């Protein structure tokens, strides 16, 4: 739906006839007409219409004493600064003049607009006004100047560093105004990320006092910036780290979720240094704010749940195990439900297992297919994690088999493979359902799991040979995953039972895998089994294939090193993806300006290639002006050559033309040498 702001007549389609009308309004002698024309121009610009043709007329209104009009013109200039920087450079004298105005708003606007012009020419004009703005008496100007230093550094790093702008920016960290401090910290952090080896922003203990003072006085954006800078603070002194964390703890009560998670980040970075008592105190303070985030919008809930997942892996006892806040609500989006199921599984223990099983049993009857599948998987994980409820979980699985709903039956079969690896004695409960279940299996994962069950427990399942034979009859049409499982299953069947029919089944599968299959993995495994199944190796094969399998356990945690790295990336995409930043953003961070510069470079390269092609074309057109009287081109007729092979004495232009000449149809008969002019006319 289009917002009401854009439904007014001002935002209707921008017609060509309106251009002349706006031009007249922009140069009107009446101020109210000029203001109205600028507003209409910006309205058209806001909805994506190209009004850059009005740039000269809009620029004329820059030299005005009307603050409202000047702000509108600056807004127009900032919008076109990235796409039309060469036009904006025309107004640089006005920018420099405005940077010395008595009004701090105008001074800040001038500095901000000059920083938005992304051409190297602007640096010479920007340097002196920016140097003055960094020491301006008004904090609003200093705040804008701090951000402008980053933009200058992005344009020319050497110039910015050699002219003392970095040192002036570092001095702003001690500014009495908290907003200026926040902007200075953010700018230094961004500069440091571009050149970490130069160490422009290293947070030390002497800096933390000023940051703490600013932390309690600035808005939420400033707090997030300062908290992220405190997360950069590294120390081996426990007292210093405790002081920082104690000052950060009150930020847990902030209403903004970004501030809360940034405070959590600071705590998690420093918490390995502390004693168990202080660690317990910090986790106790951290838990309620994290749970409060689950009552916010769904998008914030998702980010909170992904970060809670990481914290739970580090500290499983942070929450009360009987809390119901992680139970799924009927109106939760699917992505929230999926994350909550993971948390429920992580919190499952003997104290809350009955309530957890009852809740998961209720989820099985939901209508969302993916949610039900994930619930069944969670039931299997709970069975592995809490052995006391294995009978309850298998009872739920058998109830699902009774329902005979295809996708549920298939997911249960996949889970049962894992459950039976730890509880093989429970296979007896599954026996009455195997013949009926196998007909419902279409998912490759489920069919391969069923093949594993039939092979692993072939000595217990009376119909294992028959069921495997039915699956093998369609082996050629199965996925590789199923073919590998069937191959292993029939080998187990043969080694455990040793019946004649089973031997025939094994030979049938081996023959297909070795002689008919084109997959190298399947053939290699078949060759290995074929050598193992020779009479002299039967006992060795039984020890290898039918050996006792190691018990499985529930472990869904990330590697310790990866977990510690991700806990230091809370409030970033890395903590949501559960991946290190370099795995999805590359080795460097690229902003919109860097991408735009790269696009311009590619356009310049393409344009240079076009010019080069045009120049080559011009040379070809001037071929008739060349001197073709080269002796090699008129060689004696007794020196036969083929028409497809240029003469050694011809020049490069003639080589080009003769390369396009059709080859001779009679290679046995030598072709007389022709002059270069004949070759040219022969085209």
From Swiss-Prot:
Chain positions found as Phosphoserine: 675
Region called Disordered, residue ranges: 629-649
Any single GO CC term annotated in Swiss-Prot or TrEMBL for this entry: plasma membrane
Subunit: Adaptor protein complex 1 (AP-1) is a heterotetramer composed of two large adaptins (gamma-type subunit apl4 and beta-type subunit apl2), a medium adaptin (mu-type subunit apm1) and a small adaptin (sigma-type subunit aps1). AP-1 interacts with clathrin.
Gene3D superfamilies: Leucine-rich Repeat Variant
Organism: Schizosaccharomyces pombe (strain 972 / ATCC 24843) (Fission yeast)
Molecular function via GO: clathrin binding
Highest classification ranks of the organism: Eukaryota, Fungi, Dikarya, Ascomycota, Taphrinomycotina
Record keywords, A-Z: Cell membrane, Coated pit, Membrane, Phosphoprotein, Protein transport, Transport
Entry-linked Pfam families: Adaptin_N (PF01602)
Membrane-topology descriptor: Peripheral membrane protein
First-listed, main subcellular location of the protein, grouped into a coarse class: membrane
The keyword Membrane is assigned to this record: yes
Protein name per its UniProtKB record: AP-1 complex subunit beta-1
């Amino acid at each position: 739906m289009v917002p009401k702001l854009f439904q007014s007549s001002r935002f209707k389609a921008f017609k060509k006839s309106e251009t002349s009308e706006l031009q007249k309004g922009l140069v009107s002698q009446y101020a109210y007409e000029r203001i109205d024309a600028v507003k209409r121009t910006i309205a058209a610009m806001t909805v994506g219409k190209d009004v850059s043709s009005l740039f000269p007329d809009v620029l004329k209104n820059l030299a005005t004493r009307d603050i409202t009009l000047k702000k509108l013109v600056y807004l127009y200039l900032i919008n076109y600064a990235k796409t039309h920087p060469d036009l904006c450079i025309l107004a640089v004298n006005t920018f420099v003049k405005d940077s010395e105005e008595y009004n701090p708003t105008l001074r800040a606007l001038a500095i901000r607009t000059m920083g938005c012009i992304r051409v190297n020419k602007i640096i010479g004009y920007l340097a002196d006004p920016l140097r003055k703005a960094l020491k301006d008496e008004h904090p609003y100007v200093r705040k804008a100047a701090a951000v402008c230093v980053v933009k200058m550094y992005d344009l020319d790093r050497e110039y910015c560093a050699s002219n003392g702008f970095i040192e002036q920016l570092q001095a702003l960290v001690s500014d009495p105004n908290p907003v200026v401090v926040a902007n200075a910290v953010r700018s230094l952090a961004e500069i440091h990320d571009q050149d970490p080896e130069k160490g422009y922003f290293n947070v030390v203990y002497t800096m933390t006092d000023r940051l703490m003072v600013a932390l309690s006085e600035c808005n939420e954006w400033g707090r997030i910036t300062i908290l992220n800078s405190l997360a950069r603070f590294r120390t081996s002194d426990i007292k210093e780290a405790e002081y920082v964390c104690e000052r950060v703890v009150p930020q847990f009560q902030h209403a903004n979720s970004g501030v809360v998670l940034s405070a959590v980040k600071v705590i998690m970075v420093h918490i390995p240094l502390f004693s168990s008592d202080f660690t317990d105190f910090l986790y106790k303070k951290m838990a309620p704010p994290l749970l409060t985030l689950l009552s916010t919008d769904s998008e914030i809930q998702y980010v909170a749940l992904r970060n809670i997942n990481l914290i739970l892996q580090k500290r499983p006892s942070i929450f009360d195990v009987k809390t119901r806040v992680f139970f799924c609500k009927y109106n939760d989006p699917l992505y929230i439900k999926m994350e909550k199921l993971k948390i429920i599984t992580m919190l499952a223990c003997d104290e809350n297992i009955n309530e957890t099983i009852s809740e998961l049993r209720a989820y099985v009857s939901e209508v969302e297919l993916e949610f039900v599948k994930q619930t069944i998987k969670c039931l299997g994980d709970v069975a592995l994690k809490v052995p006391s409820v294995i009978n309850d979980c298998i009872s739920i699985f058998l109830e699902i088999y009774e329902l005979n709903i295809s996708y549920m039956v298939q997911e249960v079969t996949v889970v049962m493979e894992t459950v039976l690896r730890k509880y093989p004695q429970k296979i007896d409960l599954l026996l009455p359902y195997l013949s009926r279940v196998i007909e419902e299996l279409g998912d490759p994962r489920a069919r391969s799991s069923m093949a594993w069950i039939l092979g692993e427990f072939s000595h217990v399942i009376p119909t294992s040979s028959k069921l495997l034979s039915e699956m093998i009859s369609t082996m050629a049409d199965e996925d590789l995953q199923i073919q590998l499982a069937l191959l292993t299953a029939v080998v187990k069947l043969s080694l455990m039972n040793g019946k004649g029919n089973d031997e025939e089944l094994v030979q049938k599968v081996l023959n297909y895998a070795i002689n008919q299959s084109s997959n190298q993995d399947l053939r290699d495994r078949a060759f290995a089994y074929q050598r193992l199944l020779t009479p002299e190796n039967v006992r060795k094969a039984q020890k290898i294939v039918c050996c006792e399998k190691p018990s499985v356990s529930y472990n869904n945690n990330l590697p310790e090193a990866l977990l510690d790295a991700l806990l230091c990336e809370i409030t970033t995409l890395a903590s949501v993806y559960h991946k290190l930043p370099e795995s999805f953003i590359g080795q460097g961070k690229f902003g919109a300006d860097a991408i735009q510069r790269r696009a311009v470079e590619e356009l310049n390269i393409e344009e240079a290639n076009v010019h080069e092609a045009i120049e080559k074309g011009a040379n070809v057109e001037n071929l008739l002006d060349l001197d073709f009287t080269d002796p090699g081109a008129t060689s004696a007729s007794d020196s036969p050559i083929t028409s497809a092979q240029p003469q050694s004495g011809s020049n490069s232009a003639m080589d080009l033309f003769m390369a396009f000449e059709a080859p001779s149809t009679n290679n046995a008969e030598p072709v007389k040498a022709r002059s270069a002019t004949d070759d040219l006319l022969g085209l």
